[in-house]
């Protein structure tokens, strides 16, 4: 028997169907000489720091840095059953070979190898490496399985990445958490991502709005605008001069321009567009795409490619024909796809772009939940746009001179709507029309037929006032773009991963920052919290710059190619962890207080007016020179069996008295209702007295 191990149950089922393994068992499928099982993502991972000794169970500066000499692995607590199943299958006497069918990429290699090694498997290993889950691609992949040893360098690269993230993440998180007495999660990807939000927030906060003006001339019904003018008086003077002058057309340029169709979706671009059109978070979009994938209506979503493989032309053509019949917005549209634009096997690494599948033919779109239907339709519309004709237009720029200044008018004439017609139709069909973030260049009007040398006497002129605008806060769409581009100028063109994170992990990074209290959502906006801003301020540039990721990716790419030494890379990471701990042995008192939660004052001190706060045993004045203190265990309250709560303290500070029910009388042994009055005489101790309600 040949044991095939996929990354997820849904993928295993697809492979099993192709191989003829139809008999369902607990945790695997079998038949036709194959056993097909799955990993459920990361079954095995690097053990936590506490696994390396008692001294690491408690977070302390003295135990840092933590540098394991022999790495330990652990099975995820909620996945022990599936690991046991895989281990038993690997050790079955009738299994003579194991096929790694996990995702074709660095992380897929790591997921399989961790399980293979922890299970103690020594059987021959081969690798399935495919870019499509179409039946034909799976069959072809199994006909050309490669020896597992050919991917040893890729595994070494993946292992280095995992260990390096562990070393820097664990040591930096513990170091700064201990120093600041507050849990501060530090990570190679999430920390530079947080810095992007903090930098944008600072740019908005320091932005100073400035007014500027344009003088606009009306010429044969068209409008020509001056350059930006910062002084209102200067703009008014130019307007007056122009109205008494002559405008001359000094330049007329006509250019035929082309707007190429958008590329197919990879995960990040799908998340950006879904956020822009529907307001979905990156995680929501990933979850929806995954659900559609498991329903076999959408191809694998965790991809960084925007192309299809060369052998998918016929498949794509069939899907496009299906979409034209399924989508109401394509009704009456004669469409001939240009498939060559989207086929390029060289630009597909792990998985091809996200597109609908032929399963759509059997599916009723209206039966899907609306949010899933939105994602599926979006992916389908993008496939249609990507294979449509380019949008072509004639751009006209006319320059005029008047009163010694230049004025420009711009217009366009559409020659072929191309893909923008499909985009327009798709948007018109949306239930909720999205807000437009940018001014569409299609709104430029057609200019009248100007000629060079044409003159206009005493043109009508107006002055328009404008404000410079601050940068916009990041939303998920803009942050995903920034993460994708981050550090790319420092990254090797051949690096498998560029930017911060991967398409599959960026959503989780954003969610982790929100959950950790470093970022908050306000509508579509992502804003850093006070803790988030402080964290970026206290961390060294090494940890907040995307350059570290770029450097790592360059090295990891070389390791994957067998051109760099994994041991040397890890030695450098360990040195970095040592240096980090060595550089930050202690903090000043002021800095150590940065992450203390803001205290809420109970009221004002009756003696000096300073805020009064709750302590462990008392309520005290924050002015160190003032001795006003109300003790929680004051004998006055204990004798009357009253718990001196913050609510009572606040009332005493506000009005000097508080009504309390069921006061105990030591003399009578009974309870009564009364008013406790703050009878402060300014001495070392605060006094109180009880006033009884007046009898009517």
Feature map (PLM): residue ranges:
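Conserved short loop/turn motifs at secondary-structure junctions
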Residues: 1, 101-104, 181-183, 254-263, ...
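Feature marking long nucleic-acid-engaging regions of large polymerase/nuclease enzymes
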Residues: 97-98, 114-127, 188, 199-203, ...
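C-terminal or mid-to-C-terminal helical accessory/interaction module adjacent to the motor/catalytic core
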Residues: 135-217, 254-258
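Intrinsically disordered, low-complexity regulatory segments
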Residues: 1-162, 166, 427, 470
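Basic, low-complexity terminal or inter-domain segments flanking catalytic cores
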Residues: 2-3, 25, 79, 90, ...
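Metal- or metallocofactor-binding catalytic centers and their adjacent structured scaffolds
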Residues: 233-265, 271, 547
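Amphipathic alpha-helical transducer elements in NTP-driven molecular machines
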Residues: 9-16, 33-36, 40, 76-87, ...
């Amino acid at each position: 028997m040949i044991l095939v191990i996929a990354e997820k149950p849904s993928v295993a089922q697809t492979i099993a169907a192709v191989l003829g393994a139809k008999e369902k068992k607990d945790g695997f499928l079998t038949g036709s000489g194959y056993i097909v099982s799955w990993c459920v993502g990361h079954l095995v991972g690097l053990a936590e720091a506490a696994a390396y000794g008692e001294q690491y169970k408690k977070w302390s500066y003295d135990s840092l840095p933590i540098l394991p000499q022999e790495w330990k692995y652990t099975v995820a607590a909620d996945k022990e059953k599936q690991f046991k199943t895989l281990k038993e299958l690997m050790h079955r006497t009738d299994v003579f070979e194991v096929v790694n069918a996990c995702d074709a990429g660095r992380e897929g290699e790591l997921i399989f190898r961790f399980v293979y090694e922890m299970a103690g498997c020594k059987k021959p290993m081969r690798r399935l490496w495919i870019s499509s889950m179409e039946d034909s691609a799976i069959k072809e992949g199994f006909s050309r399985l490669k020896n597992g040893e050919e991917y040893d360098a890729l595994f070494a690269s993946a292992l280095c990445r995992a260990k390096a993230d562990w070393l820097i993440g664990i040591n930096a998180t513990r170091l700064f958490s201990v120093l600041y007495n507050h849990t501060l999660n530090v990570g190679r990807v999430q920390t530079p991502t947080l810095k992007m939000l903090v930098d944008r927030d600072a740019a908005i906060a320091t932005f100073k709005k400035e007014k500027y003006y344009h003088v606009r001339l009306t010429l044969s019904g068209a409008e020509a605008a001056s350059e930006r003018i910062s002084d209102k008086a200067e703009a008014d003077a130019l307007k007056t001069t122009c109205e008494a002058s002559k405008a001359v057309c000094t330049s007329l340029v006509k250019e035929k321009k082309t707007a190429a169709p958008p590329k197919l979706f990879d995960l990040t671009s799908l998340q950006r567009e879904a956020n822009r059109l529907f307001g979905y978070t990156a995680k929501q979009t990933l979850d929806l795409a995954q659900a559609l994938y498991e329903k076999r209506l959408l191809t694998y979503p965790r991809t960084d490619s925007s192309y299809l493989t060369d052998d998918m032309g016929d498949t794509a053509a069939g899907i496009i024909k299906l979409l034209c019949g399924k989508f109401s917005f394509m009704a009456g549209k004669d469409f001939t796809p240009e498939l060559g634009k989207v086929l390029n096997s060289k630009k597909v690494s792990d998985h091809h772009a996200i597109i609908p599948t032929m399963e759509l033919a059997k599916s009723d779109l209206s039966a899907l939940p609306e949010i899933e239907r939105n994602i599926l339709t979006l992916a389908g519309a993008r496939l249609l746009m990507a294979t449509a004709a380019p949008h072509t237009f004639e751009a006209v720029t006319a320059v005029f001179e008047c009163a010694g200044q230049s004025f420009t008018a711009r217009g366009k004439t559409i020659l072929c709507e191309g893909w923008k017609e499909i985009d327009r139709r798709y948007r018109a069909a949306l239930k909720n029309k999205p807000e437009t973030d940018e001014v569409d260049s299609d709104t430029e009007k057609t200019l009248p037929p100007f000629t060079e040398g044409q003159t206009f006497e005493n043109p009508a002129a107006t002055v328009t006032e404008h404000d410079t605008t601050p940068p916009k806060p990041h939303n998920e769409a803009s942050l995903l773009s920034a993460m994708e581009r981050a550090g790319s100028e420092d990254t090797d063109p051949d690096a498998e991963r560029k930017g911060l994170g991967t398409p599959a992990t960026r959503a989780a990074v954003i969610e982790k920052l929100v959950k950790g209290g470093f970022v908050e959502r306000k509508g579509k906006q992502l804003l850093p919290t006070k803790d988030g801003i402080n964290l970026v301020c206290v961390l060294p540039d090494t940890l907040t710059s995307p350059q570290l990721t770029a450097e790592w990716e360059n090295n990891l790419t070389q390791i994957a190619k067998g051109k760099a030494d994994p041991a040397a890379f890890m030695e450098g990471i360990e040195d970095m962890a040592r240096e980090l701990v060595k550089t930050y042995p202690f903090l000043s008192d002021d800095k150590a207080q940065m992450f203390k939660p803001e205290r809420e004052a109970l009221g004002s001190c009756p003696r000096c007016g300073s805020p009064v706060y709750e302590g462990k045993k008392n309520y005290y004045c924050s002015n160190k020179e003032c001795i006003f203190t109300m003790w929680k265990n004051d004998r006055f309250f204990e004798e009357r069996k009253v718990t001196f709560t913050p609510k009572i303290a606040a009332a005493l500070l506000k009005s000097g008295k508080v009504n309390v029910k069921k006061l105990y009388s030591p003399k009578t042994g009974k309870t009564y209702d009364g008013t406790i009055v703050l009878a402060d005489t300014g001495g070392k101790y605060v006094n109180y007295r009880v006033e009884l309600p007046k009898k009517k």
